[in-house]
Structures are given as structure tokens and as C-alpha cells.
Amino acid sequence: MEAVVIDAGSKLLKAGFAIPDQAPSMIIPTQMKIMNEDATLPDSPSQQANTVDPVVRGFIKDWDAMEDLLHHVLYDGLGWEISNEGQILFADPLLTPKAVKEQLVQLLFETFNVSGFYASEQAVLSLYAVGRISGCTVDIGHGKIDIAPVIEGAVQHVASKRIEIGGADLTKLFAQELAKSNPLIKLDISEVEKLKDQYACCAEDEIAYEKTLQSCNEEQHTLPDGQVISIKRERYTVGEALFQPSILGLEAHGLVEQLVRIISTVSSENHRQLLENTVLCGGTVSMTGFEERFQKEASLCSSSIRPSLVKAPEYMPENLSMYSAWVGGAILAKVVFPQNQHITKADYDESGPSVVHRKCF
């Protein structure tokens, strides 16, 4: 049986057997619904259920909910059988606390009785997915942006940075902007997210964005209840916030400048391999015009440091950026488990959860 690869994001959990040139067989909401104190499946139709988020801004926060979610994924979704569990490779977010790593390995060995475990950081795995071991990843997730330089398969943690904004924050911004221009229409956040996915885009540059504030074509969208909503400059504001964080009320540099500053803190002998191997990942990077805007901002850098993007190999699945860490995990699983580089049950029984820091790095 192939090892299972899991990448649990704040919005979506990606899981499947380690087949590198295929998309993960399960891509499901991480958020769960709770009814009568019992966790139901993520797609429960109940209208009265409360929701719980096992993962918040990349890190596991609700371990009971995570256990329920993993049980559904492994046994119901992927067909594991009790007492015949297999191996798991987990994609770790940047800067995962040691205590979280230990609790995860404890959960998997003691509750799920896995036969083997390995974890690697998402930044490293995303590079593996495009055939690189060195480079810099810009991962725009649902609840955070991680920028991480990686040299020879090792994340440079001192230089790495997490920015506490993500797709969810852009959705809230879009909701606020739509409410200003459509004050009589009430939208729930799930409707706003669908509208964002359909209409949000990036202007060509800051000058082009300023022009949209003065004049912008109007889109008319009919909602399921028959109401018609007007969408104009709001769709550009969402993308612009990544390059002008002041739109979100943040005193921070734009995405490309953040990347350049991070690379500049790494030894100059590594600048070139980091610059020439910049990888964009996360669902938000598929926003219309985002990649072009990123490249234009990079070309305008006054610094000698000018990032260039790595394209996904043609043989990789479409929309690779949405689950590149999972694909990289599938590639790595083909190495670590056959070569016995993983944590075995015997390793865990001998050393306990702390073995994860010695065997997975």
C-alpha cells in the first residue's frame, strides 16, 4: 500500500496516496460542522450545525476536530482498515511549533496506529514539486502568507517570514467593499468568497490600479435569490492589497518587496539560486493577473535582486500551485519510506514524540 500524503490547510485538506504526477484524490474543506456535540462530515447538509476550524492560520488548533477529520479521510475516504494502517507523510507549515509537531506524531501513532511517519516543511515540498531543491517559496494560504528561502532542501528559518494575512482576509476586504457599493444587499461570507474567486483580479501596476478608482467597467452579477449585485473597482482592490498592504490597514511592504528583503538577508553567494527559483503557491496565486503583476513588480525592483518565477513541469497536474506541497510530499514519500528514513513504530516506542525532531528536519 502506498504511503498517504496529507497537507492540511486552514481552508482545504489535501490527501491521497503518494502518486506524484496526479492531483490529490481528496480535496475537502478543513472546516467541520458540529451537531449535537458530534462532529459530522465536512459536507454535512445540516443548517443548524455550528462550525469548528481544526486548523487556524496554518496550525492545528482543535485536536479533537482534527482527529475526527483525519479519521474520515483515512478510513472513509482512502479506505484504510483498522489494524492494517499504513504510512503517512505530513506537510508541515512554516515555523510549526515543536509542541504541535510532537502532538501530531503522538496522535498518529497512538490513535491511528500508523506504521510509519514523516514530516517535511511545505516550502521544501513545493520546490520538490517543480524539480528544485533550492529556491524561495511565496505561499499565499487561506490564513497566512509564508515566504521561505530554501537552500539544498533546508529552510532558512532565520530569514523566513510569516505574514498574518491570507485569502480569508481578502474575502473580508471584498465583503466590506461590496457592502459600500451595494448597501441594500446582504451577503454571507461563502457567497462573497465565490464572487471573489470569480471576479477578483490584479491591476497591471499601481498606476493602472489608481485609474480603476476613477473609472472602471461594471459587472452585473445575479445572485441565487435573484438580486443583482454591482461589481466595479472592488475586484481590483482585493488583488492590490497584496502589493499595497495599507489597503488592509497594515504598515508593511508589498509582497515582492518583502521577498526581495528576505532574500537580501541570506548570504550573497546564494542569491542567484534563490532568485532564479521563486515559486508561487496557494490558491490565491491563480487570481487573474496576479502572476503578471508579480513579475512586473519584480522587474521594477531597484535592487540587483530581481526574482524570476519557476514554471511547473508540463507533466505535473493542472493548477499545481493549489497543491504543490502535496505533490512534493508524494515525490518525497517515494524516497523516505523505501529507504527507511522515516519514523517507525519502534522508533516512536523507544523515544516518544520527541523523535520527530531527530528524524524529520
What kind of feature is each model-predicted range?
Residues 2-107, 116, 146, 157-159, ...:
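Conserved phosphate-binding loops in N-terminal lobes of ATP-dependent enzymes
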Residues 3, 114-138, 180, 328:
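Conserved phosphate-binding catalytic cores of ATP/NTP-utilizing and phosphoryl-transfer enzymes
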Residues 6-12, 130-132, 137-145, 150-154, ...:
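A short acidic Gly-Thr/Ser loop motif
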Residues 69-77, 237, 241-274, 293:
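Phosphate/ATP-binding catalytic cores across multiple sugar-kinase/actin-like superfamilies
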Residues 92-100, 108, 200, 204, ...:
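Glycine-rich phosphate-binding loops at beta-strand->alpha-helix junctions
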Residues 151-252, 277:
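Phosphate-binding glycine-rich/basic clefts of nucleotide- and phosphate-handling proteins
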Residues 185-197, 201-218, 307-361:
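Acidic, glycine/GT-rich loop-and beta-edge segments that sit at the periphery of enzyme/chaperone cores
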Residues 269, 279, 287-311, 334, ...:
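Catalytic phosphate/nucleotide-handling subdomain of diverse soluble enzymes
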